[in-house]
Amino acid sequence: MSEKTIVKKETNVDFKKPKMYKVILLNDDYTTMDFVVEILITVFHKTAADATRIMLDVHRKGKGVVGVYTYDIARSKIALVEKMAAEREFPLAAVMEPE
């Protein structure tokens, strides 16, 4: 019977944290406050109280950060906001910026 030798090689792997992006909701004159709160609760998983606070901040300042995510997650959340807004014929928009 032949002998088998197993050699284990130790590898050091450095993992970098992924780059993060702020998702920013933009205010407009047509989207209702109730719809913005609904978006914040359903898409961004905010509590009703947090959603209301963020919505008022966006309303007063013209824009507001709703969350910080990796690129792919931020992109998909923005796409979902745009899809839901279009279905209701609202011009609500969101953008992302590197953190």
UniProtKB/Swiss-Prot annotation:
Family from the record: Belongs to the ClpS family.
Pfam family, one: ClpS
Organism in which the protein naturally occurs: Acetivibrio thermocellus (strain ATCC 27405 / DSM 1237 / JCM 9322 / NBRC 103400 / NCIMB 10682 / NRRL B-4536 / VPI 7372) (Clostridium thermocellum)
Subunit text: Binds to the N-terminal domain of the chaperone ClpA.
Signal peptide positions on this chain: none
Official protein name in the record: ATP-dependent Clp protease adapter protein ClpS
Physiological role: Involved in the modulation of the specificity of the ClpAP-mediated ATP-dependent protein degradation.
Gene3D superfamilies: 3.30.1390.10
Top-level lineage group: Bacteria
One GO-annotated biological process of the protein: protein catabolic process
InterPro entries: ClpS, ClpS_core, Ribosomal_bL12_C/ClpS-like
